[in-house]
Amino acid sequence: MQTPEAGADSTVSTVPLQTSVPVQPAVSGQQVASQVPVQQQAQTVQQVQHVYQAQVQYVQEENNSVYTNGTIRAYSYSEPQLYNQNSSGNYFDTQGGGGSAAQVSTVVSTHSMANNGNGTGALAMGLTGGQIISSSGAYLIGGNSMDGSAPHGAAQTTRASPATIEMAIETLQKSEGLSSQRSSLLNSHLQWLLDNYETAEGVSLPRSTLYNHYLRHCQEQKLDPVNAASFGKLIRSIFMGLRTRRLGTRGNSKYHYYGIRVKPDSPLNRLQEDMQYMALRQQPVQQKQRFKPVQKMDGVSGDNFSSAGQHTPSAAEQTFIAQSQHHQQFLDGSRALPEFVELDLGEAVDGVGPEDVKALQTLYREHCEAILDVVVNLQFNLIENLWQTFWRYSASSSVEGVTITENSGLSEIEGRLPRARLILLCRHEAVHKWMNTCDHLMYQALVEILIPDVLRPIPSALTQAIRNFAKSLEGWLTNAMSSIPPRMINTKVSAVSAFAQTLRRYTSLNHLAQAARAVLQNTSQINQMLSDLNRVDFANVQEQASWVCQCEEGVVQRLEQDFKATLQQQSSLEQWAAWLDNVVTQILKPYEDKPTLPKAARQFLLKWSFYSSMVIRDLTLRSAASFGSFHLIRLLYDEYMFYLVEHRVAQATGETAIGVMGEFQDLNTMSPANIDKDEVSEMDSDLDEEMEEADEPLAKREKVEADVIQVLQVGAMEDGSSAVVGIVQPSMINSLPPTTNNHSEHILSTGTSTIRHVGNTYASV
């Protein structure tokens, strides 16, 4: 056993914990009298320096004596007695004389319980916390808590007892020469530490951050702080088992305490957020350079610069960096931003020159790269600031009564592209289309960074952070663009809404995948599912679903057999994913390189969902024991099918998955006909009658709103319905002189075709 001076990083020895461990020492009455009674164990603490197999040595102030162990006597304890947690956790025997009082010596040590799989465990005695309790007949090492139910080692740091706190104060008194008056103040310091910090695995805090928090506390309470070295000893005496690590980039690394964090309900969390917010607001974002994470920000003036001109991260920044490092291993930080297409206005715009168009392209590229950088570093709260800077949001903000003016980086951007010219460009339809395309590329890259594999386990804290980020996006962007033309706002919000919805869907899919993984790994559940599935009357299911789905009977039977075979093989989640991907490939193969693939893909999703719901209904009516497992699997497979199909459609159309989903996001500016493009001919029979009376050619357009025109091709689908060729804005159409028969010809700005306008429809000439 080691002394407290050995340091928290020392190797912990392991002593097997058995049900018969008392030892009978040869202790004289005088020596027993010198011990401290159990009732007073919180007042006196004695350190045990060494424990040998045949000897027990007590380290006392005056006399160090070694006593030979006596005859070992066996005691029986039940498992509930041994492993249940209670306030003391001490076991001792009072044999040998009714009048002898039990004695206690507190050992400074940590505890960890390792389960070896057969119901027994080993207790590791480390550096502080256990107790050796003696009576007339035995000594027993007792721990504060043990966990024998865990399937793996449950080693963790523990918090000090009141006796250990007093010992820490006494140690500081001796080592630092503190007066009794100053040492009495340490109680409040220690209580503050216990109220605001807790031990946790996988996290760290910079040593400077803890000390800065402590200095702030002392300043607020008008207390005299101890120096940094004494504070470090105080931390280690309270939170046992802390390790020290040096984290950070080369030349700018800092020492961190590993295994401690700020409590979630501590006011220090708010302090850290405010410090980071203030540092950000004072940071002029230099758009001509790629925006870097907090620890690499350029342009901060004042005391945060070292003599070499490099930015020295503040304590709050270091804390944020350290806490994000654990989650960054789940991201794909190697992904770069794709190249953007060139912006071509097609015609001159009054008040805007070619240099302004070039400046917009350059600034927006740098803006998107900055967004990608902060997302890679999980600094989601910086996105709002980047948007406000680019879109010239100039309103002042207030934090706790302090008015903060926006950073001076606006002037640098204003010099490259004045706000008035930016607004002129934002009114041009070509800029809307170009920026929408750029946004889809950027948001798709962000999705693949944050969730590179939807089936890979993601920490719940990271999942929640992503979902909170998605929830805030639309509000941040709308607020930042408050002075921008509404049409541009609609374009931007449509893209960011698709991005937010994709993040929500993918995190939900990931959550379902982890829940289903446990089911697929359970052999008994799989066997029960297979047994219940074999009782389903699939012929009856096919008969009921055939009128709605109109699926080929051979395809349905093949899918049924493949599903049962895959289930019987007890396939893993990844194997099921490969099977689902193969199903999508087989179903969509006849539509490859055809414009009808998007509709065929959507129809497949509807049919898959309807057919699977019929199977679930049959299982429900039969009261299948595995109904819950099937319901979970069905939810996962439906969602994963959606994921696969949207990527197949994106690949076939040359769009991103975000772009495919973005077609349906802007519901405020699109009519219901635009939401269900493939069903326009069924939804508007009046239009069909009008077109028949006018005897129009095969291609037609329906002007459903003043600002949206749909391009339809009559009879293009196998069932005779009309396929949607595309959507254009009226501003892209240049009117020509009217022709005979009351027809008005128009030519698209893109030069794709010539169309004829009749009433509220457009038809090709």
Swiss-Prot record:
It comes from the Eukaryota. This is Transcription factor RFX3. Residues 189-264 bind DNA. SUPFAM superfamilies: Winged helix' DNA-binding domain (SSF46785). The keyword tRNA-binding does not apply. It comes from Danio rerio (Zebrafish). GO terms for cellular component: extracellular region; nucleus. GO terms for biological process: cell differentiation; cilium-dependent cell motility; DNA-templated transcription; endocrine pancreas development; epithelial cilium movement involved in determination of left/right asymmetry; regulation of DNA-templated transcription; regulation of insulin secretion; regulation of transcription by RNA polymerase II. InterPro entries: DNA-bd_RFX (IPR003150), RFX-like (IPR039779), RFX1_trans_act (IPR007668), WH-like_DNA-bd_sf (IPR036388), WH_DNA-bd_sf (IPR036390). Its main location: nucleus. GO terms for molecular function: DNA-binding transcription factor activity, RNA polymerase II-specific; RNA polymerase II cis-regulatory region sequence-specific DNA binding; transcription cis-regulatory region binding. Gene3D superfamilies: Winged helix-like DNA-binding domain superfamily/Winged helix DNA-binding domain. Belongs to the RFX family. Transcription factor required for ciliogenesis and islet cell differentiation during endocrine pancreas development. The lineage of its organism: Eukaryota, Metazoa, Chordata, Craniata, Vertebrata. Pfam families: BCD_RFX, RFX1_trans_act, RFX_DNA_binding. It is found in: Nucleus. Keywords: Developmental protein, Differentiation, DNA-binding, Nucleus, Repressor, Transcription, Transcription regulation.
